[in-house]
Amino acid sequence: MKNKKGGGAQLWGMVLYDIIGDGCLNGVWTNTHTESKKIMNEIARKKKNDEKDPIAGEYYVSWIEEKGGPVSGTLKVESKITHYSFEWIVSGKTSFKGVGILLGEKRLAVTYWDGESIGLPVG
């Protein structure tokens, strides 16, 4: 999910998660800086918490960069009633932020952008 090309163009992308019964999110993702528009994989395992919402909470998250190897961190998901907010944290710093909505009961669609940016990636 890394910003590979730079050049001032803002990174943004999409993740489509399958919601697995054991509290995991299994996602496929791509973004505006992924070479050859490849689809990559991400897995998020939910940490134990007292959230009433089955999606909201903190997750251990890992993905593999096309040219950089594995990346691990924390994914924070917060319920906003009509949608969810997402924050990917790597090495103690926010890497990406996003918003998502449920698609039925077992899927979650999320758009995300570079965590240093302010606001949504829409001009």
Where are these regions (language model features)?
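Central antiparallel beta-sheet cores of small beta-barrel/beta-sandwich binding domains
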Residues: 1-123
